[in-house]
Amino acid sequence: MNKVVLISGGAKGIGKAIALELGKQGYDIVINYLTSELEAHALKDDIIKNYGVRCLTIQADVSREDEVDEMFSLIESELGGVDILINNAAIDLSNLFHLKNADEFRKTLDVNVVGAFNCSKKVYRHMLDQEYGRIINISSTNGINTYYPMCIDYDASKAALISLTHNLAFEFAPYIHVNCIAPGFIGTENELDGYDEEFLKEEVEKIMVNRYGDPKEVAYLVKFLVSDEADFINNTVIRIDGGQKGSC
């Protein structure tokens, strides 16, 4: 039977690329989304048509424990337990510090960190019982260095996700491997549509390979980390940023 992969925030961007790549490799896929319903269902249809694996789409706010409980109940009834968890769901409410309020700060942490906590807690028992599990947390180079102003809540959440990775790896060893990927500037829909051409040009100049990353390149790294070939990789943060230069 195929291993089951849950990707939070899996309908667009990096999450979509991961869903497509792992579906191509023969994994059964669960696409979690919150608002991107059309994109999620279109992605599901593509995966089933092209790769012949089982695929579910489930709307759930991963920051809410009750909705995560319902999501996992549905997964277990349809596919069984989750063998591989990709904590990818994230929001970015960028603003200057003096214009930001505590509710915005809290919301970012709730989705980006508490969401990963909630999903990791739900997969733990199944993974432990079968003596196998893989958890990949999608952080950011912003969780390691500060590259931009106005990102205090996002950066703090991504740094917390790195810390969560290390703590879970210690507690979940030896059977459950927990690793973290820290992408730099990746050419997702949000990134390319959200900035003007001049800003994108300036960002590329800060990258040693002189281009921004493709979501597929993050997906290729995920594919490796969940494979048997990566069995000796655990409790690790891997940057995928083309050699990002400088920080604030």
Name each region found by the language model.
Residues A11-K12:
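Conserved glycine-rich cofactor-binding loop
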Residues L96-L109, I135, E191, F199, ...:
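Substrate-binding pocket helix/loop in short-chain dehydrogenase/reductase
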Residues S120, S157, T165:
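Active-site helix of classical SDR
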Residues R125, H166-P174, D231:
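Alpha-helical segment proximal to the catalytic Tyr-Lys
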Residues S140:
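Residue(s) in the substrate-gating loop at a strand-loop-helix junction
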Residues N145, K223, N234-C248:
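Short C-terminal tail/terminal secondary-structure segment
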Residues I207-V218, E229:
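A conserved structural motif in NAD(P)-dependent oxidoreductases
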